[in-house]
């Protein structure tokens, strides 16, 4: 009973509406940039704030923007992985629209293909690596912030990002080689 009263008091002290107003746009952009689908983004957005509430019930939160960005990235990467598993060999064209400034159809198709390939490659690497990579490359997080968030040294973050880039390059090269091989095998 005492714990419940404390929990209710704690939740009342934190103005969730204000937190969502203040951080919601950044959280939404982070999620949508990865999932590229309104329905999936809506679900990830809700899951992010539910997870934040649950975490804040267990321990005090020092940096809400950082926590929300980490949770959002994690939820979005998980969603992409699940979607790729469900649609292993199907085209994921609704996921693959790249952010561009009024490109022509050819540039849109190329950007969509690159985005699809990157999402596929991100789904092949460990979740933590994908999360750190996305926070750095898409979220603009500095090595120091990543080191603090993931309890790593700054040097370890740099090494992990370097290895992740290399692994993604290898996966993308392999995928390109397989695609070319399949195209060559098709009868004319």
Residue locations for each model-derived region?
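Σ70-family region 2.3-2.4 aromatic/basic alpha-helix that recognizes the −10 promoter
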Residues: 46-53, 62-82, 161, 165
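Arg/Lys-rich amphipathic alpha helix in sigma70-family domain 2
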Residues: 70-91, 111, 174
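Amphipathic, Lys/Arg- and hydrophobic-enriched alpha-helical face
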Residues: 19-38, 54-55, 122, 174
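DNA-recognition helix of helix-turn-helix
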Residues: 73, 77, 150-179
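A short pre-motif secondary-structure segment
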Residues: 132-136
């Amino acid at each position: 009973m005492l714990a419940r009263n404390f929990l209710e008091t704690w939740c009342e002290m934190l103005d969730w509406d204000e937190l969502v107003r203040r951080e919601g746009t950044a959280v939404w952009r982070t999620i949508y940039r990865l999932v590229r689908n309104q329905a999936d983004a809506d679900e990830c957005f809700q899951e992010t704030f539910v997870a934040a509430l649950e975490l804040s019930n267990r321990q005090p939160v020092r940096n809400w923007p950082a926590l929300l960005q980490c949770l959002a990235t994690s939820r979005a990467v998980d969603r992409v992985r699940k979607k790729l598993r469900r649609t292993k060999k199907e085209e994921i064209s609704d996921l693959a629209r790249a952010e561009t400034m009024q490109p022509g159809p050819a540039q849109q198709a190329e950007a969509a293909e690159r985005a699809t390939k990157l999402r596929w490659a991100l789904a092949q690497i460990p979740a933590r690596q994908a999360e750190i990579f996305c926070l750095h490359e898409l979220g603009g997080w500095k090595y120091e912030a990543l080191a603090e968030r993931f309890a790593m040294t700054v040097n370890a973050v740099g090494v992990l990002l370097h290895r992740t880039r290399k692994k993604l390059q290898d996966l993308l090269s392999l995928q390109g080689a397989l695609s070319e091989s399949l195209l060559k095998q098709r009868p004319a």
